[in-house]
Regions:
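Catalytic-core regions of glycoside hydrolase
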Residues: 1-174, 261-265, 269-272
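C-terminal non-catalytic alpha-helical accessory regions
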Residues: 137-142, 157-276
Length: 276
């Protein structure tokens, strides 16, 4: 994120103070850990525009020996500069998918947050120019998103929906792939807590029906529980018109809290909602 004091020695941060400090840190790290590889993050560069990408490109055109990779991404669309004008220094490009906090708060507070369509769209934007990445993870609730990103790094031509189907087959059962995959599509459509529609009822019914074909071990696994609870919470929030109230929601949030071992967490962003 942005840093520096805003003086002429620091600003614009991404084109002056930041690369200057990173170059020094790179030298220290390589001295202490020979063979280490350096990834230079450009998170939030030119947000708003400040000439950071151009400045970094100029610096790395003169000397790129102190870093091995450029990592780029944003909260929404992938940054256009490295795609349209080339990666600074001609270095390999990594992404930094925001798979945890996007579109919901508290993060993970409603259970699983599968985003296969969003991740497919963002991957398509990178035009096969990505050499790997570092998904930003805040917890186990984005397990499906982690698997999607990992598989795209392995085979970028594979559709995310196909990855989800394999995930369901491996983690749950081949017999429930169709129903659970459809439920996950609905959960993504209802990702925003302000726009949960009647399809939430169908998603929960599909998950509940699928549970009947699973072994007890799978039904009690945390991966299944966070998906089941997300479907249940969405259904209840549709019924309550978004109000966090009622015994069903209270029990669901309490179970999520226990699964996350978040009973003693200090603040709401990392703790599911609490209903007294």
């Amino acid at each position: 994120d942005e840093g520096g004091c805003g003086c002429n020695e620091c600003w614009p941060w991404g084109a002056r103070g930041f690369p200057k400090l990173c170059k020094e840190f790179s030298c220290i790290a390589r001295d202490k850990f020979p063979g280490i590889e350096i990834v230079l993050s450009t998170w939030m560069f030119d947000t708003p525009y400040a000439g950071e990408w151009e400045g970094l490109s100029k610096i790395l055109s003169q000397d790129k020996s102190w870093t091995n990779y450029i990592m780029a991404d944003s909260h929404e669309d992938f940054p256009r500069y490295p795609l349209d004008k080339g990666v600074p220094g001609g270095l390999p490009l990594l992404n930094f998918p925001e798979i945890s906090m996007w579109g919901q708060s508290p993060w993970g507070g409603y259970g699983a947050n599968p985003l296969p369509s969003r991740l497919q769209r963002l991957w398509n934007e990178t035009e096969n120019k990505i050499s790997g990445g570092f998904p930003y993870s805040e917890g186990i609730y984005e397990d499906i998103n982690k698997v999607i990103c990992s598989q795209l790094y392995w085979n970028g031509d594979r559709p995310t929906k196909d990855i989800v189907r394999e995930y369901i087959s491996f983690e749950f059962s081949l017999s429930v792939v169709d129903k659970v995959a459809k439920a996950i599509d609905i959960l993504e459509l209802n990702h925003s807590r302000k726009h949960i529609d009647s399809s939430a009822i169908e998603a929960f019914n599909l998950i509940e029906q699928s549970a009947q074909n699973l072994t007890q071990q799978v039904r009690e696994s945390w991966r299944w529980r966070i998906l089941f609870l997300r479907a249940l919470i969405d259904r209840e929030m549709f019924i309550t018109k978004g109000k966090l109230e009622g015994e069903i929601l209270k029990k669901a949030f309490n179970e999520l809290t226990a699964i996350y071992h978040a009973e003693n967490s200090h603040s709401m962003p990392i703790h599911p909602p609490v209903i007294q």
